A protein has these predicted regions:
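PRPP-associated nucleotide enzymes
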Residues: 1-334
Length: 334
């Protein structure tokens, strides 16, 4: 283990919103176990509510002079309210004397609105990123599997952007270790090909993608399969966002019609909008996601923890010659 070398004399502190506390606590424990004899602070944020929907963030710990790693989430049903509360939280930490703030945000809202696809509309993802990073003490961001890589250019400084394959590749290798010759990675649409090429290369299996006839937002029919043959294969359909999941369900039907022996539906960010739970349950296929967003428990749903990866990213930012790229290239150290 390289020598621990904090970026500034004040050391670092993990601060978390209530719903991110389980992930933040686990990350804190991992960091404490790896950085021997070095105390890493931990504090949670309490939110008091008042009339007219006013919210007051209260930091339950000392952050003065610290480099704060702030775990933020957008688990609520009203992400625009979550945005404002997040800004209040960042402001409170800054005003409490934090030296620097790194935002740890597994997923941002508004990511699918990443470009102007018609006139007189905003690039919402850009607005969200700028609103969260436009603070003097916010110096860095750690995030996961953004919908479009070009969003990295919006940040004041390039974020530590962990791709989804870093999490899903170990799961695939562990789950199908004795059947890897039967595995095919499936792109549910052409837009996910680049992302899944990396996953397929990491686990050394073939790739195919489904061509869709797009009728409207969230309404698509699969019309063709291109690439690897899926007959008799274990098909792992992978995407970054699982929202209403209608396309995922249709993908499963198409793959079965083409002779797939087994289907697993996977996605980094479980948005699960509308009737997604019912839609996915009715497919009869196992579903695997990360805990970037809160989910309900179901027998068919497996949730992979992000804490080890986020902890490693934080660690690599605080050791001599640390490199988050090594985490992306090689996975978690054994």
């Amino acid at each position: 283990m390289p020598k621990y070398k904090p970026r500034h004399p004040g050391g670092m502190t993990i601060v978390t919103t209530p719903s991110m506390a389980p992930m933040a606590k686990q990350a804190h424990e991992i960091l404490e176990s790896k950085i021997k004899k070095k105390s890493i602070g931990y504090a949670e944020i309490k939110y008091d509510s008042f009339s007219r929907c006013e919210v007051l963030p209260i930091i339950q710990g000392n952050v003065r002079g610290k480099h704060v790693y702030l775990f933020l989430d957008f688990n609520g049903n009203d992400w625009m309210r979550d945005m404002f509360v997040s800004q209040l939280t960042i402001s409170a930490i800054q005003d409490a004397g934090a030296d620097k703030i790194t935002l740890v945000i597994p997923t941002f809202p508004g990511q699918r609105q990443d470009r102007k696809d018609r006139s007189r509309v905003p690039i919402s993802a850009k607005v969200v990123i700028q609103a969260l990073t436009n603070f003097e003490t916010v110096v860095h961001v750690i995030t996961l599997d953004m919908h479009a890589e070009q969003l990295e250019a919006v940040f004041p400084r390039a974020p530590d952007h962990l791709p989804g394959f870093v999490i899903f590749a170990p799961w695939i290798l562990e789950t199908f270790h004795d059947r890897m010759d039967q595995v095919v990675i499936v792109c549910p649409d052409a837009g996910s090909v680049k992302r899944n090429q990396r996953l397929a290369k990491r686990v050394n299996v073939p790739l195919c993608f489904l061509e869709k006839n797009r009728k409207g937002r969230g309404d698509n029919d699969v019309i063709a399969i291109h690439g690897a043959d899926v007959e008799g294969k274990i098909c792992i359909v992978n995407d970054d966002l699982l929202d209403t999941s209608g396309t995922m369900a249709k993908s499963g039907v198409t793959l079965l019609d083409h002779g797939a022996s087994e289907i697993h539906l996977t996605g980094t960010h479980p948005v699960f909008g509308g009737d997604a739970y019912e839609t996915l349950a009715q497919t009869g296929h196992p579903v695997v996601v990360t805990d970037s967003l809160a989910t309900r428990e179901h027998d068919w749903l497996t949730v992979l923890p992000l804490a080890p990866y986020l902890a490693e990213a934080i660690l690599q930012n605080n050791i001599e010659d640390g490199s988050v790229s090594s985490l992306i290239l090689n996975g978690l150290p054994t």
